[in-house]
Amino acid sequence: MWNSGFESYGSSSYGGAGGYTQSPGGFGSPAPSQAEKKSRARAQHIVPCTISQLLSATLVDEVFRIGNVEISQVTIVGIIRHAEKAPTNIVYKIDDMTAAPMDVRQWVDTDDASSENTVVPPETYVKVAGHLRSFQNKKSLVAFKIMPLEDMNEFTTHILEVINAHMVLSKANSQPSAGRAPISNPGMSEAGNFGGNSFMPANGLTVAQNQVLNLIKACPRPEGLNFQDLKNQLKHMSVSSVKQAMDFLSNEGHIYSTVDDDHFKSTDAE
């Protein structure tokens, strides 16, 4: 599953290291105002979308918007209908059944024989993270990550994240600046597997982290919930996803171990 890969909207989604976040300014650029900085920062959020939304996005002053939500970096989930490799790039047609298939271009490093240069075969369901682009009024994605789905629940999760993300961002953007709630920063799930929880809900946790935390909170036993019971209740998640969510919650002070390293209780427990 996708854990904290695009999991919230902050400076960068991948790995939390900011490696994919473009620098807002440039050499010789005038110092931007606070409003400009905030606007540009918002544009760096990785927003879960459908292809239909991307195709209907409007481009004004070099900024894409879906309604009042500014977008630049997005994620989509769909099936590859066609793949074509050229010397410097791979072009996919990806279909999520909300509109016509969309062109997704992934540039390849001709000096690198890594898996990033391997063509993902047609009829494979994938999650794509990339930048929305428009050329001659035709929209496409320039992908910086394409990952085959490991679990078809990720497709359903993505649709829920799309709804949640756009509701939250639309509400946030409609509020006065002074009263706008901060939007937290994303992370990455399993080694590059930008898990199905790209969006962080209001408490700053991913879907997977919230599921783990809520189960631990709900356990009435004094010693807390043990890992085996937790894993059995989260059969839709891989073991590594559960462990990563627990590691994050423990490091952030949401849960703590009790009688041994396999039993956990919430710090909010009575």
UniProtKB/Swiss-Prot annotation:
DNA-binding region: 74-148
Residue numbers of N-acetylmethionine PTMs: 1
UniProt modification remark: Differentially phosphorylated throughout the cell cycle, becoming phosphorylated at the G1-S transition and dephosphorylated in late mitosis. Mainly phosphorylated at Ser-23 and Ser-29, by cyclin A-CDK2 and cyclin B-CDK1, respectively during DNA replication and mitosis. Dephosphorylation may require the serine/threonine-protein phosphatase 4. Phosphorylation at Ser-23 and Ser-29 is a prerequisite for further phosphorylation. Becomes hyperphosphorylated on additional residues including Ser-4, Ser-8, Thr-21 and Ser-33 in response to DNA damage. DNA damage-induced 'Lys-63'-linked polyubiquitination by PRPF19 mediates ATRIP recruitment to the RPA complex at sites of DNA damage and activation of ATR. Ubiquitinated by RFWD3 at stalled replication forks in response to DNA damage: ubiquitination by RFWD3 does not lead to degradation by the proteasome and promotes removal of the RPA complex from stalled replication forks, promoting homologous recombination.
A single GO molecular function term of this UniProt record: single-stranded DNA binding
Region (Disordered): 21-40
Signal peptide: none
Domain of life of the native organism: Eukaryota
Annotated stretches, region: Interaction with RAD52, TIPIN, UNG and XPA: 187-270
Pfam families: RPA_C
UniProt keyword annotations, A-Z: Acetylation, DNA damage, DNA recombination, DNA repair, DNA replication, DNA-binding, Isopeptide bond, Nucleus, Phosphoprotein, Ubl conjugation
Gene Ontology terms: cellular component: chromosome, telomeric region; DNA replication factor A complex; nucleus; PML body; site of double-strand break
InterPro entries reported for this sequence: NA-bd_OB-fold, RFA2-like, Rfa2/RPA32, RPA_C, WH-like_DNA-bd_sf, WH_DNA-bd_sf
Modified residues (Phosphoserine): 4, 8, 23, 29, 33
Residues carrying Phosphothreonine: 21
Subcellular location: Nucleus; Nucleus, PML body
Main function: As part of the heterotrimeric replication protein A complex (RPA/RP-A), binds and stabilizes single-stranded DNA intermediates, that form during DNA replication or upon DNA stress. It prevents their reannealing and in parallel, recruits and activates different proteins and complexes involved in DNA metabolism. Thereby, it plays an essential role both in DNA replication and the cellular response to DNA damage. In the cellular response to DNA damage, the RPA complex controls DNA repair and DNA damage checkpoint activation.
Subunit structure and binding partners: Component of the replication protein A complex (RPA/RP-A), a heterotrimeric complex composed of RPA1, RPA2 and RPA3. Interacts with PRPF19; the PRP19-CDC5L complex is recruited to the sites of DNA repair where it ubiquitinates the replication protein A complex (RPA). Interacts with SERTAD3. Interacts with TIPIN. Interacts with TIMELESS. Interacts with PPP4R2; the interaction is direct, DNA damage-dependent and mediates the recruitment of the PP4 catalytic subunit PPP4C. Interacts (hyperphosphorylated) with RAD51.
Family: Belongs to the replication factor A protein 2 family.
Protein name, entry field: Replication protein A 32 kDa subunit
Organism: Pongo abelii
Lineage of the organism: Eukaryota, Metazoa, Chordata, Craniata, Vertebrata
